[in-house]
């Protein structure tokens, strides 16, 4: 009887909640704050810059936070001789050419056909970058919604994983079906990490699988609808027992003068390491900032128990005012600023790829 009772309680705990009305979503706006909302209410939250997790279709465990494991990240850089030549291979012209193509999609909404097409385009670019590397993979991660996430895997000697991520979707806050070029949010971050990946895999040791750790680059679907893609990925990793030792988020890289180092819902030790990378490999100015609960995809990694860091384009309040509108266009962005973010990504990924963690 005790066994049956335990099984019944277990089943109850794992049962998915039922919406009060069809089509509503269960969102989380704080560690202990959940509520059901309509699509219109979700859109209003997005327009008001209120971060939230949409946990409607996530595992029940996704509503709770797993404390990230502590790692002793390097206190010094060790690979300047390898990294600095890679930085010289970064091209702002190439980055901006890719961004122009990416922002030419009418929108990249996660439930739109054009959101699927833009994801397929990202996949084709990634395949072109890593397709000839033995053991490397470029693949789609299918979800319950239309747009897939995209993942690049460059294997190392261990199964410990260093992740660099950016969300690929865009949204028009007034009407999800309307124009949303999303050049800055988040075409800039998506193409920044693509440019960094291109430089990174030109290194023979990285491409030859000689790195200590495996490197993954992610382009997440559905961030604007409640961090959907990144939640799905990191919750799946958590359930599979994968060890992600670090995650760097790049959400908006093209605007502002001083980068914002996000200190909430992130790992303090990894953030300190990230500042060291900025000081060593970039000329960027930066300052600490906060973006609130569930503001971007690093929060999904943090929630799943993985150390994460987020370097934003600016301190909050000095960022691009044109996001979530038809006016988020490429002409407002600074190619040199985006290149500094790409340098950060290359340095971060390379140093941690060879770190003993």
From Swiss-Prot:
Task: Recite the UniProt cofactor note for this protein.
Answer: Binds 2 Zn(2+) ions per subunit.
MF GO annotations: aminopeptidase activity; metal ion binding; metalloexopeptidase activity
Tell me its cofactors.
Answer: Zn(2+)
Q: Which UniProt keywords apply?
A: Aminopeptidase, Disulfide bond, Glycoprotein, Hydrolase, Metal-binding, Protease, Secreted, Signal, Virulence, Zinc
Quick one: which residues bind Zn(2+) 2?
A: 185, 224, 324
Top enzyme class of this protein?
hydrolase
Which Enzyme Commission numbers does its entry carry?
3.4.11.-
* Cysteines paired by S-S bonds: 291-295
Sites binding Zn(2+) 1 sit at 167, 185, 251
Sorted alphabetically, the Gene Ontology cellular component annotations on this record are: extracellular region
Q: Name one GO biological process term.
A: proteolysis
Per UniProt, subcellular location reads as: Secreted
Family, per the entry? Belongs to the peptidase M28 family. M28E subfamily.
Q: What interactions and quaternary structure are annotated?
A: Monomer.
Give the protein's biological function: Probable extracellular aminopeptidase which contributes to pathogenicity.
Classification via PANTHER family:
AMINOPEPTIDASE YDR415C-RELATED, METALLOPEPTIDASE M28 FAMILY MEMBER
> What protein does this entry describe?
Probable leucine aminopeptidase MCYG_04170
Organism, by scientific name, is Arthroderma otae (strain ATCC MYA-4605 / CBS 113480)
